[in-house]
Amino acid sequence: MKAWLVVNSFMNSDKFKHLYEMLSLAFNKRGVSLDIKTASDISLEVNKKIDEKVDFIIFWDKDIYLAQRLEEQGYKLFNSAKAVELCDNKILMYQALATANIRIPRTFIAPKTFEGLNYSKRDFVNGVIKQIGLPLVIKEAYGSFGEQVYLANSLEEANKIIDQIGYKDFLMQEYIASSKGKDIRINVVGNKAIVSMLRENKNDFRSNISNGGTGAKFEPKQEYIDLALKATKALGLDFAGVDVMFGPNDEPIICELNSNPQFASTLQYTGVNLAEVIADYILNNL
């Protein structure tokens, strides 16, 4: 059996290489030849038929255009192009979660603007602050590892952040103070919660391990697991890292979902190798 692991052309750090090696080893152990491919390796030409035969593709990139082209030409992707798109764009993600009646923070989408105009009118920011108060969480539509997520403690800080964002799409959310610097990463594969990890960061409102947080194996309440599974299903994901916050009354609130989670830290803190679980799931669902 032959498959591809499609990865980003420009992300070549040791962290990513280690993850790719974990996946390759898991599939090789199961008799699958897993070739690592980038967009350049496959084809950049829109009107060219991609004719190499593979049994399936693990799509570990966020190149939605490539994912769509591959599916249009008959390739089976894990995760699907649509699922990756919904996770990659936070605006689409929260809209889909809201449509499915899944508990998320109160979320407001900034009006559309364009390069050169930027967000020249800021009355909408005042309107949001009047409704949900301060601090205000500001998230760019695209971003990973918490790097495009900001906390504004005043209108002045919010305006400075929006100045930096320029004309890029962003959203605003209520700040969940009860979950400051902590959340639960629930790793889901095939609509099953495989292992969960409590992530904490005492020096930041974001819990990301890449920002200095730590992790520990954790057994969440069933309602947290149920919400994570419901959210995963709503976005059509085969596997995902689901980040769940602690609400003010200890109720679960979805922070976000990741279609290609960096699970080396999960192995480090829980001893569970998600590459093995993903490999078994895919081979049982072809």
Residue ranges with predicted function:
Residues 6-116:
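Conserved N-proximal alpha/beta basic substrate-recognition cap immediately N-terminal to
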Residues 108, 141, 175-176, 187, ...:
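Anionic group-transfer/hydrolysis microenvironments
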Residues 136, 194-195, 240, 253:
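Protein kinase-like catalytic core scaffold
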Residues 233, 247-286:
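C-terminal active-site "lid" helix and adjoining low-complexity regulatory extension at the edge
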Residues 145-235:
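Phosphate-binding site of ATP-dependent enzymes
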